Amino acid sequence: MNRIKIESILMLVAALLSQFAVSCNNHNNEPMTKNTKMEKILFINGSPNRDGNTAALAKVLLEGREYETLNLNDYRLNFYGQTLEGDQLDELIAKMKHADIIVMGSPVYWHNICASLRTLMERFYGYVPSGEFKGKRLFFLYQGAAPTKMMIDAVEYTMSRFADMYGFAYEGMATDRSEAKTLREKLESTKQ
């Protein structure tokens, strides 16, 4: 009888430790929500404002799903061609490789993608082999003071070329809450 109680307690402790380990993997204290497909989702926030409009748009897109937020402002990322110590590009790329779905987000700065996200993308060139991210889905969030059609078209072209070069399946872009809700339908669809 005591052995059955001990085994039951051990099973309960193991289940609690497992749940604790999952919650500890969320280093950014983001709300952990259920991801029905168990795909690993990484949101790369290019905004220096970690809780700003870019993050809010990600919450709309990723509503109801578990995801990790990577704030680029928390990482040292040298510009293309710099060889300064402390660069964390390898760490960023490792996190991206571990994810099934990557959502990149940028505020509109000077009619374009913000510098931190642009730097990450530029650093791929010559460092990451072509096709390295084959099979991973890429979504883009681009928000700001009413981006014009020309700005949206230019960024859409940039993102689709980036995706093509590195093997991502580019799923599209959202610039506001309504578009993020529409893009969520693609997120919820089966892998293409």
Place the predicted regions along the sequence by residue.
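Short, glycine-/small-residue-rich phosphate/pyrophosphate-handling segment
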Residues: 137-172
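N-terminal beta1-alpha1-beta2 submodule of the flavodoxin-like/Rossmannoid cofactor-binding fold
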Residues: 24-129, 160, 164-192
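Short, glycine/serine-rich, charged loops/turns that create anion-binding
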Residues: 16-17, 48-49, 145-147
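A glycine-biased structural micro-motif
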Residues: 133-135
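Bacterial N-terminal signal peptides that target proteins for export
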Residues: 2-10
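Bacterial N-terminal signal peptides
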Residues: 11-19
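N-terminal hydrophobic targeting signals that begin at the initiator methionine
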Residues: 1-2, 39
